[in-house]
Design a protein with these regions (language model features):
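N-terminal first-folded block
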Residues: 7-43
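Residues that form or immediately flank small-molecule/cofactor binding pockets and catalytic motifs
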Residues: 10, 55, 88
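Conserved N-terminal entry element of GNAT/NAT acetyltransferase domains
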Residues: 1-7
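Enriched for short, Lys/Arg-rich terminal
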Residues: 4, 13, 23-26, 61-93
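A short, surface-exposed loop/turn module that caps and links secondary-structure elements
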Residues: 35-59
């Protein structure tokens, strides 16, 4: 099921910073977002539910040390993904 991506301002800011520095990161992020739209639980994404202070959110891998934090939300009557953060493992957790 295709989902709509709803990036937060902080996600957009972080993704611009990351992709400006590194073309490989830009490509990894683009591919991960395409997979998220098609199937958020594609095995290549390693999607998992978060606990603790990030409870209610999910994380997926967008490359070796790149993670996307998101939530499943309703948007205009269908399921969407609210993109909250992107960065290295240490930056987002």
């Amino acid at each position: 099921m295709k989902r709509v991506l709803l990036p937060t301002k902080s996600f957009l800011h972080l993704s611009r910073q990351l992709t400006r520095k590194n073309r490989t990161v830009a490509e990894d992020l683009r591919l991960a977002l395409e997979l998220l739209v098609e199937d958020a639980f594609d095995p290549r994404l390693k999607t998992h539910k978060l606990k603790g202070k990030l409870a209610g959110s999910w994380a997926c891998s967008a490359g070796y040390d790149l993670r996307i934090i998101f939530q499943f939300v309703q948007h205009r009557g269908s399921e969407a993904l609210l993109l909250e953060a992107v960065g290295s493992h240490d930056e987002v957790y």
